[in-house]
From Swiss-Prot:
InterPro entries: PGBA_C, Quinoprotein_ADH-like_sf, WD40/YVTN_repeat-like_dom_sf. Residues 420-541 are annotated as: Disordered. One of its GO terms (cellular component) is cell surface. Plasminogen bound to PgbB is capable of being converted to functionally active plasmin. It is found in: Cell surface. Pfam families: PGBA_C. Residues 456-476 have a biased composition (Polar residues). Binds plasminogen, specifically, and in a concentration and lysine-dependent manner. Plasminogen is the precursor of plasmin, a serine protease that cleaves fibrin, fibronectin, laminin and vitronectin. Acquisition of plasminogen/plasmin could enable H.pylori to degrade host components. Residues 420-434, 446-455, 480-541 have a biased composition (Basic and acidic residues). PROSITE patterns: PROKAR_LIPOPROTEIN. This is Plasminogen-binding protein PgbB. It comes from Helicobacter pylori (strain J99 / ATCC 700824).
Amino acid sequence: MNKPFLILLIALIAFSGCNMRKYFKPAKHQIKGEAYFPNHLQESIVSSNRYGAILKNGAVIGDKGLTQLRIGKNFNYESSFLNESQGFFILAQDCLNKIDKKTSKSRAAKTEETELKLKGVEAEVQDKVCHQVELISNNPNASQQSIVIPLETFALSASVKGNLLAVVLADNSANLYDITSQKLLFSEKGSPSTTINSLMAMPIFMDTVVVFPMLDGRLLVVDYVHGNPTPIRNIVISSDKFFNNITYLIVDGNNMIASTGKRILSVVSGQEFNYDGDIVDLLYDKGTLYVLTLDGQILQMDKSLRELNSVKLPFASLNTIVLNNNKLYSLEKRGYVIEVDLNDFDSYNVYKTPTIGSFKFFSSNRLDKGVFYDKNRVYYDRYYLDYNDFKPKLYPHAAEFKTSQKGEKGNAPIYLQERHKAKENKQPLEENKVKPRNSGFEEEEVKTRRPEPTKDQNNAIQQGETKNNESKNTPISKENAAKKEAPKPSSKEEKRRLKEEKKKAKAEQRAREFEQRAREHQERDEKELEERRKALEMNKK
């Protein structure tokens, strides 16, 4: 085969393979209007995590907006914002970056002796590379504005309670420090993890324990009240090799929800529930969980991870979850704002994000700059949108606009639309049942068995027939006409009904599984209590 032709063929195959990738692109009639990011920041975002973002000028954005913290440029170390906890801004600092090697070389004579000395100095500096956590008080009148605690390696997440600092380090170790004495009270290292998700959860202090979100897909529970800090439980969520760190962790009373990129774990009063999927982000609010998935779904779940509602946007790459005014908002990476009404999860609105002046908001039609969001705002590069004041520019056809249904063009199963209609009518879907009729043979048998009517009976029958004829001649009422003209269910309606029945059966099955798991947990707890009681009796003897 001709070599140039072979190269051209390979190039065409590769190019066609790249073009096969599909992106979220709603039809024009589905786009309700334009959503602007009208507010400006002084500088653009250079780095962000789940709890904050750093701007180019060193300003820090937290979960309540712009803070008074400013991270100055220092040639001896780099700082990263981790979290704001218990009145402290927590910064992770790495002293690796600026070794004064060039100036030493320029000042020293280029002799073998000075080069050997320089190498010795460099080796000594490398041995003394420092990592530390700095706690900066957010109270300007505090007696001690800054506390620095040296670490063995770089800190990835941290939180404070009272005089204790809980830190998860890059070597997958959980550490507990006394802030006043800077003494290490507890440390336990897990298996190393080479790649992690940037959405790193922070440790959470409870009444008697602290929960560490580890990099290897597990939760380490440490008792810090009764004597020396002691690990009391390991909860394994996922065992994947890559990107397996805990990305989300929240405690709500007796309930706890944690997640990696592949699995969600919910602990409800001691009972565990799991959900597996490609998880982008999630948000827990007032007993309900909202999940973004890699395939463009927005899921609504209860605490037992039972799916309540869902919206599917084909090929959408979703980012950020903001709940405001009973609506859910999410950014789509190709330049759209998605709006879902929490009262009507069967539909959604799409708003396009336009170009702002000479600055193209989404370069190459892709959200590829720094992003951060809090309870009410979404920050992108140097702009932000406050959903408390969300005023999109509606297109002229918006007055006649129908919110995009989940069943349109394969967006989601059609039966969910019928489910919504059933909610409105407050009546379950029912199949029109036709009453069984007797066959002609059965009618003849009945006639033969009937006794012949007497004369009086014949008169009564004739009068009844005349009345029936009169009633037939009278005009038919609207209700009776509607009943007679009621069409038979179509094949589509029948399919919807069957799907609804399947979903109902599935929900009942989940409820039975829930009860079964609850019984198993109860039996296990009773068994453990019995074993402990026997052990105590043996010890007494």
